[in-house]
Regions:
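Signature aromatic-anchored transmembrane alpha helix within multi-pass, membrane-resident enzymes
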Residues: 37-40, 231, 259-262, 267, ...
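C-terminal luminal/periplasmic domains and tails of membrane-associated envelope-modifying transferases
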Residues: 2-19, 25, 451-556
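Short helix- or helix-capping micro-motifs
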Residues: 164-169, 196, 216, 220
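Interfacial juxtamembrane loops and adjacent helix segments
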Residues: 11-12, 74, 78-138, 281-333
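Perimembrane helix-loop-helix junctions
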Residues: 197-205, 229-265, 278, 360-371, ...
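Hydrophobic, aromatic-rich transmembrane alpha-helices
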Residues: 148, 343-370
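Transmembrane-helix signature of polytopic, membrane-embedded enzymes
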Residues: 34, 105-116, 148-170, 202-203, ...
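Specific aromatic-rich, kink-prone transmembrane helix
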Residues: 146-151, 186-203, 215, 405-409
Length: 556
């Protein structure tokens, strides 16, 4: 069996930097500046994420995950949120367990109601509970920064690693979603980790192929949208084992390598469910649609627990709903295939965009880097293509894997040994960093300078690109400080409970238009989709204030 893994002759990949000559000791003095810069970059990212998390109220999806996490930890039941596998929620559950909230085991309600009940109706402090729930995701996000650094360093040297890490640490999307108790960044980081380990398997397949599978399994056990990456990473594992082997069994070893990745990934998914409930009890408490055709066949063939397959059916059911989107000021029904590329153009710093394009070109065009191109570019391209076919045009979080993979590619630009290239990379990294830092602490509604910055993002995009319900606490402070005693009419899009934060407001859509006088407060996502009475109310009002670039205060 050992012969199936590796042959006596192992070729060293030409794309890796040449090691130091034999007998030449590595001087520790050369390492500490790099280590110091890595620590500084991660420390500033941690500061940005923690201080952002402290001030934000629950976003739309977070109560669902926090409620499910509490249920997993305290009741060990698979009842709610089947459309997402449990591993990412269990990570959130670590923070929930440390917060030790009061949990009502007898509560009956859907997953959204469960989260709101836990946060606002059970005697818990939602500020404290949400911070604890977010901290494990923040820690994971920081650890994925080390993967970005290590991947780029192995391809193009320590300076490339630092450039890649800087782009990662200053990515507004990564900071925004890495500081929330959600699943997008944990899933994306797990795919990146698997790709990096598969790349390393070109040298040591017996060590890294068995590690790449669990990393891929962690992604699959966190978000089902990572499934398209499975054949990509299996194929790359086969290529790595093939390259590391010699002799007549190369093809057999390559097939075994791909199989090991698949088998260990499947095992991780099963283990994640068994961690919640060793008996895998599953009785759906929500409608599970019947899926026909090729999709239905693929779901039935998945080698996962029935709850996972039902979750896939729920996801396909969500894809069939009549959603609305908002892009460049236009409200539309359905979805647009070019939505995600367009949204990324708005929400990515300009310097970062330039380095992404240059990095992809260098990885493909430079001969020494070309063997690494599939490992860096294939998985994100396949995931992006799959996401572009989705029915829900809700935000760049569906493509948050791009800032991770393309940061690695961008660092590889430094493989072009020209002084002007090094200067250009430094300037573009600095430009991206300054653009990101200027948005602090409003990373969720970030847009780059070409589109007017965070204050104008609501003109181009909606939902989690701008307003995900995160600023209800800031709104309460603003109303108390600037508008005490005034009549407030509120249209809020989010999962928070306004009255908990001291906001006494009425719904202006429930009374005649002429009775709405005073302050009209509208979430920007609601304003983007306004029609009928709400559109009339906004049209007859004048904006007087802005809260977090996600809520607009009008006066009537």
């Amino acid at each position: 069996m050992r012969d199936l893994w590796i042959a006596p002759a192992v070729a060293r990949p030409v794309s890796l930097p040449s090691p130091a000559p034999a007998g030449t000791p590595r001087r520790p003095g050369r390492r500490w500046p790099v280590r110091l810069l890595v620590a500084v970059l991660l420390a500033q990212m941690a500061f940005a994420m923690v201080t952002t998390a402290v001030r934000q109220t629950p976003t739309i999806d977070e109560p669902v995950y926090v409620g499910a996490a509490a249920e997993y930890v305290h009741e060990h039941r698979l009842r709610h949120n089947p459309e997402h596998p449990p591993l990412g929620t269990l990570v959130i559950g670590v923070g929930v367990a440390l917060a030790d909230p009061h949990v009502d085991p007898g509560f009956a309600g859907d997953q959204g109601q469960l989260g709101r009940h836990l946060l606002y109706e059970s005697g818990n402090d939602p500020w404290r509970l949400m911070l604890w729930a977010r901290l494990p995701v923040i820690a994971l996000t920081l650890s994925f920064g080390l993967v970005v650094f290590a991947f780029a360093r192995e391809l193009a040297g320590p300076l490339a690693g630092l450039a890649a890490l800087a782009l990662y640490c200053f990515s507004p999307d990564v900071i925004a979603h890495g500081s929330l108790a959600t699943l997008d960044v944990p899933a994306a980081g797990s795919v990146l980790t698997s790709a990096w380990l598969v790349w390393r398997a070109r040298r040591r397949p017996r060590l890294y192929v068995p590690l790449a599978g669990p990393a891929l399994g962690a992604a699959l056990a966190t978000k089902m949208s990572t499934l398209p990456a499975v054949p990509v990473l299996m194929a790359l594992a086969a290529v790595s084992v093939w390259k590391a082997s010699a002799g007549g069994l190369r093809l057999v070893r390559a097939v075994v390598g791909a199989g090991v990745v698949a088998l260990t990934a499947i095992t991780v998914v099963w283990v994640a469910y068994l961690m919640v409930d060793p008996r895998l009890r599953w009785t759906p408490e929500q409608h599970v649609p019947v899926v026909h055709g090729l999709r239905g066949l693929l779901v039935r063939l998945l080698p996962f627990p029935e709850v996972y397959r039902d979750g896939m059916r729920v996801q396909f059911g969500l894809e069939n709903r009549p959603w609305q989107g908002f892009l460049f000021g236009r409200l539309y029904d359905g979805s647009l295939w070019y939505y995600l590329p367009s949204a990324l153009l708005v929400k990515t710093p300009l310097g970062m965009l330039a380095l992404w394009v240059a990095g992809a070109a260098v990885v493909v065009g430079v001969r020494r880097l070309r063997p690494a191109a599939p490992y860096v570019l294939a998985a994100p391209l396949v995931l992006l293509a799959a996401a572009m076919q989705g029915a829900r045009d809700f935000g760049t979080r569906y493509a948050v894997f791009l800032p991770l993979f393309l940061a690695v590619a961008a660092g590889c630009v430094l493989m072009v040994r020209r002084r002007w290239v090094s200067v250009g990379v430094a300037l573009l990294v600095a430009f991206a960093a300054v653009s990101s830092a200027r948005a602090y602490p409003y990373y969720l509604p970030y847009s780059n300078e070409a589109f007017g910055g965070p204050g104008r993002t609501r003109e181009w995009l909606h939902d989690s690109n701008v307003d995900w319900g995160q600023d209800l606490g800031r709104l309460a402070d603003r109303l108390r400080d600037r508008y005490p005693g005034e009549r407030v009419w509120l249209v809020y899009k989010g999962s928070g409970v306004p009255s908990f934060y001291g906001i006494e407001a009425s719904d202006p859509r429930r009374v005649p238009v002429q009775e709405v006088r005073g302050l009209l407060v509208v979430s920007d996502s609601a304003a983007a989709k306004a029609s009928g009475r709400l559109a009339e109310l906004i049209g007859g009002s004048r904006p007087v204030d802005d809260v977090g670039h996600s809520i607009t205060v009008y006066r009537r």
